[in-house]
Amino acid sequence: MSFTLLPAVDVADGQAVRLVQGAAGTETSYGDPLEAALAWQRAGAEWVHLVDLDAAFGRGSNRELLADVVAKLDVRVELSGGIRDDASLEAALATGCERVNLGTAALENPEWADRVVAEYGDRVAVGLDVRITEQGHRLAARGWTTDGGDLWEVLARLDAAGCRRYVVTDVSKDGTLQGPNVALLREVCSRTDAPVIASGGVSSVDDLVELSRLAGDGLEGSIVGKALYAGNFTLEEALAAVR
């Protein structure tokens, strides 16, 4: 089983940034998104995970900039952020990206989400942003600020609709460099036949090696963000470790 790494480029106000736990106002800027994405391409990435944070938080869009980034990359792009109706989905797919991630829309408009995962197949993945609470495994919606229901109920519904891929984030881990929630990922993999991509918390090459051991269980890859930008390891080191 191969294990794919997707270095992240999160874009806010035209700049590549990183957030802590997805919270608006915690951005650290890393400069030009195209330069960031090209750097990952040069380092050997086969995929880039590109996020429009302004669209995700409902405060505008960087779509033209992101379309330009996609056009100038040779690697495959997974595009995320603010895709919640036919117009935004079609605009995202028109950038030439390989696939898009639905977030909030899959929770707040389930009929629409069920239709598009069936219609677009591999070109649509669903992001499941999980907050583990005393009430159980809850999904976080709309830029992680509202409750989106029970993880297992939503997963069963999307599976029944034919969803082809899930991107799973433990919100408490994202941007914290505290290590991924391996138990959560293992449980999600056990409950769906669709491939799963991990997101959030990766702090070291060892974390990625641990995740890659779940490839046989259905964990297809991991998004890597802050650890790369913080210099904890290079993408080349990470790719070598999981090959």
Swiss-Prot record:
A Pfam short name: His_biosynth
A GO term for molecular function: 1-(5-phosphoribosyl)-5-[(5-phosphoribosylamino)methylideneamino]imidazole-4-carboxamide isomerase activity
Compartments it resides in: Cytoplasm
Disulfide bonds: none
EC number assigned by the record: 5.3.1.16
Family annotation (InterPro entries): Aldolase_TIM, His_biosynth, HisA/PriA_Actinobacteria, Isoase_HisA-like, Isoase_HisA-like_bact, RibuloseP-bd_barrel
Gene Ontology cellular-component annotations: cytoplasm
Keywords, sorted A to Z: Amino-acid biosynthesis, Cytoplasm, Histidine biosynthesis, Isomerase
Pathway assignment: Amino-acid biosynthesis; L-histidine biosynthesis; L-histidine from 5-phospho-alpha-D-ribose 1-diphosphate: step 4/9
Any GO BP annotation: L-histidine biosynthetic process
Catalytic activity line of the entry: 1-(5-phospho-beta-D-ribosyl)-5-[(5-phospho-beta-D-ribosylamino)methylideneamino]imidazole-4-carboxamide = 5-[(5-phospho-1-deoxy-D-ribulos-1-ylimino)methylamino]-1-(5-phospho-beta-D-ribosyl)imidazole-4-carboxamide
Active site: 10, 129
Entry keyword annotation includes Calcium: no
Entries under CDD domains matching the protein: HisA
Transport as UniProt keyword: no
NCBIfam families with a match to the protein in the record: hisA-trpF
Family: Belongs to the HisA/HisF family.
Name this polypeptide is given: 1-(5-phosphoribosyl)-5-[(5-phosphoribosylamino)methylideneamino] imidazole-4-carboxamide isomerase
Species whose genome carries this gene: Saccharopolyspora erythraea (strain ATCC 11635 / DSM 40517 / JCM 4748 / NBRC 13426 / NCIMB 8594 / NRRL 2338)
Lineage of origin: Bacteria, Bacillati, Actinomycetota, Actinomycetes, Pseudonocardiales
